[in-house]
């Protein structure tokens, strides 16, 4: 809302704002507030698809802003200190309170049941309820239940998210009790709020019912899994209770739904009435505006009549004047002549205006009107304005004499003005007035940009500036239109410029005629128009940017707009000082009269405010940040001004001039309005003007009088100065005075800032001391802060403005004079501030690094975070207050979290919000900080950041918007980007910032959501810590006491609450993680495509928040750990990790942060990621994960081996329910202890590594906040990211048992990631390993752990070395490199993100790792290290020729080291396959990675890539190397995993063909990883490492360039037109075709190359060839090199894959094996998709999916079947055959089946199925899936290889390549995920492939025979499945198909986003498809599918065999699987 929820504000306001406002006053308890926020975020995550993404954003914003703003809500937040108060606050009606109590009790029960922290599920129901009531005061979980209840009462829709937050079971229980109660409450609330509608919406209730039923199914499945796994009865009981509760909830929901349906008729009418009222109000407003316009028009007409009269008089005077040439000053004759001349001038002016008007449309008319009005007004003003109508002629004559007397002065002034205007137009600040005007204008322009959103007045400001006479309303409308339509605005500006030119001519002419009136009129008009036109032209973008930057500043912008209007008036006075002083006085009087003094007040205030704003912008950036809380309102305007100014600082002179002109124009507009009002009706004019003034008055009622005086004084002084000065000297003096005044104001502001800082410090101290007071302060400060995050930012400016306003009032002339000095001062201050910020950030980074180096200097890292986020000043204060605030922050940043759970509950809402922001800021400021697992520090930091960071965060967000603080830059290079953005404000940056600000709006929304989620997470962490402390107190022992105490209902209650906390934490952190991913994606997209408004929603704030949010959840866990440690958990480091729940959560938070962030992210993307996010969001999925954890308890048992993982994982599992179950009961203590002990060790190692990683990832962190988060967990970036990715993939994509499995795996992998933390260098591989770990760790945790330790230690050494160098280089040189490549990287990242929306964390991790590898040397080192490790591990794991393959791939990579671009391509393939394999493990993430890889390799195909092919290439290298690392690591991991599970997997690998299978195994570590590790080794050895002859490439490129250069030389003098560039592109393409051998992918390649060339050459359009010829040639050569290298690489891969095919065919029966392999690959994908315990589904999936997939796969993969054996070969085959075939099928089948909307639709179903199918037996399905996955892997890998080759070698446009890569992902990269990929990922074939997985998922239960029959209907069925898959695929295909991540990818990124992309972008068009694509007919495909189904049966047999043979028998697996893969 205030914080950029503007676009979302509508929905939010409708549903949430009223709820919030009413609930704040009446219904919203603090707990409820927070709960509502949480629930809203969660609900939005769940229902992101359902507009709840927006609503949740709004809710988050509302929670943050309205909740914070009302202060009541915050105070209520305090009341929860006595939690019963909050629960029973008067807000709630007695029945509602009773229901809330019941609901809370039930929630507590459900939490206890689900999380089984309290062992007694019944006890939880009874004792837990009682105790909860008792402990609710101190237990945030009670608070959360309260929140849930409150949310439910507020919004029924909030309930599902809350349930998710609490845990699927808890949520269900909460829903059961809370739905009935809350729905009733909602009804009541709706009655109370008048907004029952959002809470009462039947659709929401229905969705809840569906969710509850999903929960029931998932809970039942979890229970079944637990029963299968012999889970503890407590967990089963809890699940049973949960199911009962869910059923009760279902009943209650049904009842409530019935009630609602009964009430709906009433509600709907009420809603309709409300809507009608709104419409009526809007219509009234419109009518009023129209009336105002009419009145203005009437006034204009009256003025025109007066003008005509005056013109007639003037015409006479003009004639005399002309005759006299202004020589005669006497009498009426001169006056008459002047009047006549004036009439002529006016007529000409009007004619010119009218001529120019038509194009401008409304604005032009208004401009014309305003011009005429300006003349009329100026004329009428020159006569006494009040007496103008009756005495106009007399006054005109008298004034004409005066004017004639001053005519010479005017002529001089006009000449000066013209020269100055020309100079100003030339960006010269020669005219101080214009510079002043420009300053004010720029601020107003920003304000106008915001104003259209905020008020019509801001528009009126802008419009009034260009169209002074237009009524404010009309101007507002016109300005809104203008702002909305910059093109129109540009036209209008052009017209205005034309008019200004005409006016100038007229002015010159009338200067000759010496008509002072005309001069004054023209001058005024020119001033207004020129200023406005310049302002508009230059600030049209900035205005929307301002909106983006300061979306929260809407209200502030109204103020600013009013300021700008007033300033414009005052400036116009200044500008019109050219006119006589009498005129000035008259004008001021007229303005005062017309505005009833408000305009003058506004002007005065605005002027001062504007000057102050400028000053404040310079000085108050930080002050505003610090004062933001206290000074939310004016600060926003200041921040907006600052944003505009900041943007303008590079062009400060211009901007100053433009601001001055705008201000002058606005002043003139005000004056004209005043005059018009006076002429027609003072009242009417006052009505209009006072409307604007009243807005100002509303904002600054107290300052109006003073401001009026100051405005009058200033205006008069300025006019006097201008009149007296008449020269630039006067203006210089004016500027000097203004600068002096501004300096004084700056001093004042600095003093104020110091005072505010002191106050803030005191407040912080008070907050630490008194959380309650902190809450009140938060309610006072945070409420406005959250309400107006920008406003808060600007609030300090308000105070400063007040002080400076008084000064400026006293020093009006000085202020006017001060303008130049002020601007220079402001610039200096801005630069100083930016430098300070840079230094601050550097300090923070250094602090964070130092703290990280301290490792587990947990306190230090939060401090570093706060340093980074807060800034240098805040650094010190926050550090001091952090320790003090730690309790407060975790206590809700208001209360000591450890002290009172009730307090936590009380403060939770506000504290969470604050903590959210704090954490976000923490994370933002020190995303590295989050690396340290120091909850106490994080808590302190959070509390500290709660306010300051909030402010700074918000300020940073606006600042990022204002100063182009790119969220991506922030996330990736927070220090550097922040510095860079702050200090460097180039025009390009400004435009980029404007674009960014759109992103920033989105990002800010995401950041808000992240903050919200983070605050929730922090609150939950506080609750968790409090509960942990309580548990500690109760148990007095870390775990030994727990088992005995667990029986105690209190302990159960506490543990239940802890479980709830953890569940909610996991969900919230998943949300945070997803939101961070979203933010990272948005930021990358923003960086890549700053044009994308969505991506930039809150680019700056989002960029940091994504990292902070990601880090926040991790910080939360870290902090909770510290809190646990603080309460004495530090004493029990084992207990701290175990109870750590926070470290576990950090790791889990990786997952859950992802999930948590997903809901927010879903909300934030609103539409984009909502589907994908929904999957991630699926909080039930975490619960599912818990059940899957139960399924993976064996893995958990293995966890003790990986106890570090286990320590974190146990909590994750505890949250998820698997470890949770043991934790809850004796197992809880045991596993926690084990986890704790190992967690301790791992934490120590991890902390040590984290230090390293923090240092290493600091660099990457700055660029990639996500890495920081993983460091927090373990390797916050890697571990958490990988785990988050895995959790996202598993929870979202494998919402079914896979989700569970993946959660446990992810937990393990997080732990492993902790191990791998040191190996962050191979973080890209590590994500794969993490994912592999997620699946394979659970299955092979020990081996994976061992291997990961091995590899990661080695990699860690390499990475540490590299990163140690990279830390310095990345922070410095790498940052600069990254900065240089930022846009390219961002575009590439955006492409990757867009393709991998479902698994942004993997992308983040990958990019982070790539960033860490900031040099090609480091990248290659990492690649080689990974390759060596992988090949060594593969050789160890597999003593076969596979090692040679691995080595060969290493050698190939090494050989590629020479060929950086080609290596990039080759490595991109490998990395793509690595990623794809990773994705196969996490099919979604892998698919996204494959997409990423394809995007990376084909980066130039996408516009972002095309933008910078070189940078893209470099990034490709990075990503390729990262992928190679991931692939190698995954291979190693797969091999290690294969040691444990290799038997099955390797068998599958044997079938699945080595390299692809290896990748698949890595990806599907549990199943395929082993196979791939075994087979891939031989296959890798078999893979002829694709090598690119760089010399040959260079020769080829030179041959091409030889032809191109002469052509370019011929046109060297020409401008690069599209035709010329097209001809160049065609020439290059033709030459390339001549030089390239024709191959099947040549067509693809050429199409891609053409696309890339077109994109890359497009940036040269409009430039002269001679200026950009060199760059153009370099660009062409780079593109050619990259694409040709890629093409050749793909050719090599294709040839290799063909050879591999042949080898595989030898190994496997030729045709049948191929088809069976395709089917098996499908099965493997599907089965692997279902390995999470979907064996049954897997079999069905195998049948169905394979039927579909076999059709698809056999069709798509016929050619590349052999490719399966070798990754390269597979790739080649995939490209050559599989890819084309895959594309064809995916095109034919996918288009029909294309998940155009599948991503979102599938998300819902998938989410549901994630819950439902999540419980499916993970290992069994994994085994079964392993077979299917192997075959599918082979197929998919083959497809991917071929596809990739086809796409890459053919340089298929990124779209196609993405499609092909999706296919690759589906086929080669994700054998295990092949089905899932085919289900979801195949973008080209993804649609149909996705549908087969859907078919598989839906049909998974069906046996293979079904698949065969389905194979025949596969194409149609795939289409059916596509649609079905969109919904069920996520659930059915997702769970059976493979680790539901594929589903997530499918519907989220791959199918929903990526699949849609593939449909829209990635779909390889028929003409693009290689000829091979059509090779197979449906019959052939069906035959192949049948064969594959047979093969699938073989895979089933293999699966049976796999357990034994998986370890080392890759050949055995190879033959069937490899044949399948290769043959496919």
Curated annotation (Swiss-Prot):
What GO biological process term is on the record, naming one? protein-containing complex localization to centriolar satellite
Sites of N6-acetyllysine modification: 399
Bias (Acidic residues) ranges: 618-632, 1768-1777, 1799-1815
What GO terms are given for molecular function? identical protein binding; molecular adaptor activity
Question: What are the start and end residues of every segment in region (Mediates interaction with DZIP1)?
Answer: 2-1460
- Xref: InterPro entries: PCM1_C (IPR031446), Pericentriolar_Pcm1 (IPR024138)
Q: What induces it?
A: Expression is reduced in breast and ovarian cancer.
Chain spans, region Interaction with HAP1: 1279-1799
Locate the compositionally biased regions of type Polar residues: 116-132, 147-163, 369-383, 425-445, 456-477, 708-719, 925-946, 1152-1173, 1232-1246, 1783-1797, 1818-1827, 1924-1933
Q: Which residues carry this modification: Phosphothreonine?
A: 859, 877, 1468
The protein's name is: Pericentriolar material 1 protein
Organism, per UniProt? Homo sapiens (Human)
The gene name on file is PCM1
């Amino acid at each position: 809302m205030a914080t950029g929820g503007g676009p979302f504000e509508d929905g939010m306001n409708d549903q949430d704002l009223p709820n919030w406002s009413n609930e704040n006053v009446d219904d919203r308890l603090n707990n409820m507030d927070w709960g509502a926020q949480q629930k809203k975020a969660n609900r939005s995550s769940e229902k992101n698809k359902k507009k709840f993404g927006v609503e949740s954003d709004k809710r988050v914003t509302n929670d943050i802003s309205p909740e914070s703003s009302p202060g009541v809500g915050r105070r209520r937040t305090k009341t929860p200190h006595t939690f019963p108060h909050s629960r029973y606050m008067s807000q709630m009606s007695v029945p509602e309170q009773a229901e809330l109590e019941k609901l809370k009790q039930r929630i507590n029960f459900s939490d206890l049941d689900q999380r089984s922290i309290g062992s007694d599920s019944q006890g939880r129901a009874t004792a837990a309820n009682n105790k909860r009531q008792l402990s609710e005061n101190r237990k945030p979980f009670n608070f959360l239940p309260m929140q849930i209840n409150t949310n439910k009462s507020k919004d029924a829709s909030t309930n599902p998210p809350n349930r998710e937050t609490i845990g699927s079971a808890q949520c269900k229980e909460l829903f059961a009790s809370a739905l009935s109660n809350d729905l009733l409450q909602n009804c009541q609330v709706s009655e109370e709020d008048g907004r029952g509608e959002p809470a009462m919406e039947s659709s929401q209730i229905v969705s809840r019912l569906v969710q509850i039923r999903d929960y029931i199914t998932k809970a039942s499945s979890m229970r079944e899994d637990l029963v299968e796994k012999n889970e503890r009865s407590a967990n089963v009981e809890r699940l049973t209770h949960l199911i009962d509760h869910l059923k009760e909830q279902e009943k209650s929901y049904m009842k409530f739904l019935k009630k609602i349906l009964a009430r709906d008729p009433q509600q709907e009418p009420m809603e309709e009435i409300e809507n009608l009222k709104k419409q009526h109000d809007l219509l009234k407003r419109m009518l009023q505006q129209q009336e105002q316009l009419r009145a203005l028009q009437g006034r204009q007409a009256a003025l025109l009549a007066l003008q005509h009269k005056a013109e007639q008089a003037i015409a006479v005077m003009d004639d005399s004047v002309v005759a006299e040439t202004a020589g005669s000053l006497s009498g009426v004759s001169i006056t008459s002549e002047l009047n006549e001349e004036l009439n002529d001038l006016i007529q000409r002016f009007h004619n010119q205006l009218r001529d120019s008007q038509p194009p401008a449309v409304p604005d032009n008319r208004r401009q014309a009107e305003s011009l005429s009005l300006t003349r009329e007004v100026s004329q009428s003003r020159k006569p006494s304005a009040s007496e103008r109508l009756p005495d106009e002629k007399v006054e005109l004559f008298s004034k004409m004499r005066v004017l004639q007397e001053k005519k010479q002065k005017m002529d001089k002034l006009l000449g000066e003005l013209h020269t100055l205007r020309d100079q100003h137009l030339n960006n010269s600040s020669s005219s101080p007035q214009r510079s002043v005007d420009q300053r004010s204008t720029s601020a107003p322009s920003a304000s106008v940009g915001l104003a259209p959103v905020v008020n019509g007045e801001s528009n009126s400001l802008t419009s009034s500036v260009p169209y002074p006479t237009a009524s404010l309303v009309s101007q507002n409308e016109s300005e809104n239109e203008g702002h909305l339509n910059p093109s129109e605005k540009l036209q209008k500006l052009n017209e205005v410029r034309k008019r200004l030119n005409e006016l100038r001519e007229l002015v010159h002419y009338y200067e000759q005629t010496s008509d002072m009136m005309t001069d004054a009129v023209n001058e005024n008009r020119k001033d207004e128009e020129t200023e406005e036109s310049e302002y508009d032209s230059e600030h049209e973008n900035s205005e929307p940017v301002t909106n983006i930057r300061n979306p929260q500043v809407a209200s502030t912008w109204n103020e600013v707009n009013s300021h700008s209007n007033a300033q414009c008036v005052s400036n116009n006075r200044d500008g019109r000082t050219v006119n006589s002083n009498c005129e000035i006085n008259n004008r001021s009087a007229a303005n005062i009269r017309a505005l009833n003094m408000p305009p003058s007040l506004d002007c005065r205030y605005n002027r001062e405010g504007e000057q102050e704003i400028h000053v404040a912008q310079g000085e108050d950036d930080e002050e505003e940040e610090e004062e933001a809380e206290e000074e939310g309102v004016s600060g926003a305007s200041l921040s907006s001004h600052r944003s505009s100014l900041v943007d303008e600082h590079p062009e400060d002179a211009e901007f100053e001039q433009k601001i001055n002109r705008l201000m002058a124009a606005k002043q003139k507009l005000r004056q004209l309005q005043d005059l018009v009002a006076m002429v027609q009706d003072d009242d009417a004019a006052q009505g209009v003007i006072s409307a604007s003034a009243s807005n100002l008055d509303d904002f600054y009622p107290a300052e109006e009088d003073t401001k009026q005086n100051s405005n009058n004084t200033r205006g008069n002084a300025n006019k006097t100065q201008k009149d007296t000065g008449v020269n630039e000297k006067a203006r210089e003096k004016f500027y000097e005075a203004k600068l002096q005044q501004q300096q004084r104001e700056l001093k004042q502001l600095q003093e104020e800032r110091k005072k505010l800082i002191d106050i803030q410090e005191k407040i912080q101290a008070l907050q630490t001391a008194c959380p309650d007071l902190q809450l009140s302060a938060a309610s006072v400060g945070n409420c406005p802060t959250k309400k107006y995050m920008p406003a808060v930012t600007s609030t300090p400016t308000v105070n400063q403005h007040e002080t400076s306003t008084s000064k400026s009032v006293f020093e009006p002339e000085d202020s006017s004079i001060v303008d130049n000095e002020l601007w220079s001062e402001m610039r200096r201050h801005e630069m100083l501030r930016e430098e300070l910020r840079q230094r601050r950030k550097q300090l923070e980074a250094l602090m964070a690094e130092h703290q990280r180096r301290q490792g587990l200097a947990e306190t230090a890292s939060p401090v570093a975070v706060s340093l980074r986020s807060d800034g240098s000043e805040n650094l010190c204060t926050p550090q001091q207050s952090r320790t003090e605030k730690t309790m407060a922050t975790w206590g809700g940043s208001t209360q000591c979290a450890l002290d009172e759970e009730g307090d936590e509950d009380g403060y939770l809402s506000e504290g969470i919000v604050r903590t959210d922001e704090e954490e976000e800021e923490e994370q933002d400021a020190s995303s590295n900080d989050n690396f340290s697992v120091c909850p106490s520090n994080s808590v302190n930091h959070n509390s500290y950041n709660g306010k300051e960071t909030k402010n700074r965060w918000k300020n940073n967000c606006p600042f990022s918007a204002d100063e182009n603080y790119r969220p991506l830059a922030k996330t990736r290079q927070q220090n550097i980007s922040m510095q860079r953005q702050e200090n460097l404000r180039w025009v390009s940056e400004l435009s980029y910032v404007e674009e960014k600000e759109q992103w920033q709006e989105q990002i800010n929304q995401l950041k808000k959501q992240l903050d919200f989620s983070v605050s929730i997470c922090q609150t939950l962490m506080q609750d968790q810590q409090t509960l942990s402390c309580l548990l500690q107190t109760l148990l007095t022992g870390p775990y030994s006491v727990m088992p005995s105490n667990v029986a105690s209902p209190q302990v159960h209650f506490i543990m239940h609450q802890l479980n709830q906390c953890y569940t909610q934490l996991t969900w919230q952190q998943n949300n945070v993680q997803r939101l961070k991913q979203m933010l990272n994606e948005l930021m990358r997209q923003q960086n890549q495509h700053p044009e994308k408004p969505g991506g930039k929603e809150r680019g700056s704030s989002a960029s940091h928040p994504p990292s902070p949010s990601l880090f926040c959840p991790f910080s939360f866990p870290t902090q909770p750990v510290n809190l646990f440690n603080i309460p004495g958990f530090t004493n029990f480091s084992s207990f701290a990790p175990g109870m750590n729940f926070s470290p576990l959560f950090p790791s889990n938070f990786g997952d859950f942060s992802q999930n948590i962030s997903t809901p927010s992210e879903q909300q934030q993307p609103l539409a984009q990621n909502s589907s994908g996010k929904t999957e991630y969001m699926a909080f039930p999925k975490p619960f599912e994960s818990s059940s899957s954890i139960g399924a993976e308890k064996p893995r958990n048992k293995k966890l003790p081996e990986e106890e570090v993982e286990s320590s974190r994982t146990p909590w994750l599992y505890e949250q998820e329910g698997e470890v949770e179950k043991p934790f809850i009961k004796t197992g809880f203590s045991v596993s926690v202890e084990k986890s704790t002990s190992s967690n301790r060790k791992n934490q120590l190692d991890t902390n040590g590594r984290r230090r390293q990683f923090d240092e290493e990832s600091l660099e990457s962190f700055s660029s990639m906040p996500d890495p920081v988060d993983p460091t927090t967990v373990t390797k916050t970036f890697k571990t958490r990211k990988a785990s988050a990715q895995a959790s996202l993939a598993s929870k979202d994509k494998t919402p079914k048992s896979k989700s569970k499995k993946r959660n446990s795996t992810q937990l393990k992998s997080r732990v492993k990631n902790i191990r791998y933390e040191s190996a962050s260098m191979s973080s890209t591989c590590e994500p794969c390993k993490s994912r592999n770990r997620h699946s394979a760790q659970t299955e092979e945790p020990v081996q994976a752990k061992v291997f990961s330790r091995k590899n990661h230690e080695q990699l860690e050494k390499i990475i540490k070395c590299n990163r140690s160098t990279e830390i310095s280089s990345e922070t410095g040189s790498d940052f600069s490199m990254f900065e240089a490549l930022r846009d390219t990287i961002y575009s590439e990242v955006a492409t990757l993100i867009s393709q991998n929306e479902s698994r942004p964390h993997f992308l983040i991790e990958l990019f982070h790792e790539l960033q860490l590898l900031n040099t090609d040397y480091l990248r290659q080192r990492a690649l080689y290290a990974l390759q060596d490790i992988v090949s060594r591990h593969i050789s160890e794991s597999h003593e076969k020729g596979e090692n040679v393959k691995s080595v060969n791939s290493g050698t190939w990579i090494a050989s590629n080291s020479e060929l950086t671009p080609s290596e990039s391509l080759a490595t991109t393939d490998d990395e793509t396959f690595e990623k794809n394999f990773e994705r196969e493990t996490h099919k979604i993430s892998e698919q996204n990675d494959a997409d990423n890889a394809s995007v990376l390799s084909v980066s130039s195909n996408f516009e972002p890539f095309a933008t910078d092919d070189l940078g893209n290439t470099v990034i490709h290298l990075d990503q390729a190397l990262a992928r190679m690392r991931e692939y190698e690591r995954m291979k190693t991991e797969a091999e290690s995993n294969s040691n444990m599970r290799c038997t099955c997997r390797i068998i599958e690998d044997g079938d699945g063909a080595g390299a692809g299978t290896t990748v698949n195994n890595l990806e599907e570590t549990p199943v395929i990883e082993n196979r791939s590790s075994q087979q891939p080794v031989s296959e890798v050895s078999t893979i002829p490492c694709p090598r690119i002859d760089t010399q040959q490439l260079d020769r080829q490129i030179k041959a091409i360039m030889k032809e191109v250069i002469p052509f370019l030389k011929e046109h060297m003098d020409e401008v690069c037109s599209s035709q010329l560039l097209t001809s160049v592109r065609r020439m290059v393409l033709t030459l390339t075709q001549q030089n390239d051998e024709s191959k099947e992918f040549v067509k693809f390649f050429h199409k891609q190359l053409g696309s890339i060339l077109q994109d890359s050459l497009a940036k040269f359009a409009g430039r002269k060839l001679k200026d950009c010829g060199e760059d153009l040639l370099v660009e062409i050569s780079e593109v050619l090199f990259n694409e040709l290298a890629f093409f050749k690489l793909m050719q090599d891969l294709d040839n290799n894959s063909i050879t591999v095919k042949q080898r595989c065919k030898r190994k496997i029966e030729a045709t049948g094996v191929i088809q069976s392999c395709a089917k098996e690959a499908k099965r493997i994908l599907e089965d692997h998709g279902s390995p999470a315990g979907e064996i049954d589904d897997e079999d069905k999936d195998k049948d169905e999916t394979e039927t579909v997939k076999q059709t698809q796969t056999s069709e798509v993969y016929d050619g590349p079947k052999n490719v399966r054996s070798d990754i390269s070969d597979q790739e080649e085959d995939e490209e050559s055959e599989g890819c084309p075939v895959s594309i064809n099928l995916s095109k034919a089948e996918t288009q029909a089946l294309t998940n155009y909307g599948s991503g979102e639709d599938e998300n819902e179903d998938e989410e549901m199925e994630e819950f439902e199918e999540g419980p499916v037996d993970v290992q069994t399905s994994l085994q079964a899936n392993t077979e299917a996955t192997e075959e599918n892997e082979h197929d998919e890998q083959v497809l991917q290889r071929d596809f990739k080759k086809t796409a890459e070698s053919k340089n298929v446009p990124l779209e196609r390549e993405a499609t092909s890569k999706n296919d690759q992902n589906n086929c080669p990269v994700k054998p295990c995920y092949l089905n899932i990929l085919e289900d979801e990922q195949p973008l080209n074939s993804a649609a149909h492939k996705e549908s087969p997985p859907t078919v598989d998922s839906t049909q998974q239960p069906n046996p293979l025979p079904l698949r065969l029959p389905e194979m025949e209907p596969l194409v149609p069925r795939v289409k059916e499945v596509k649609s079905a898959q969109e919904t069920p695929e996520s659930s059915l295909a997702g769970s059976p198909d493979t680790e539901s991540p594929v589903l997530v990818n499918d519907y989220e990124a791959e199918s929903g986003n990526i699949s849609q992309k593939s449909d829209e972008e990635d779909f390889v068009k028929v003409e693009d498809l290689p000829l091979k694509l059509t090779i197979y007919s449906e019959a052939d495909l069906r035959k192949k599918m049948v064969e594959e189904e047979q093969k699938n049966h073989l895979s089933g047999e293999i699966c049976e065999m796999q357990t034994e043979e998986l370890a080392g028998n890759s050949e055995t697996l190879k033959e069937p699987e490899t044949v399948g893969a290769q043959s496919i």
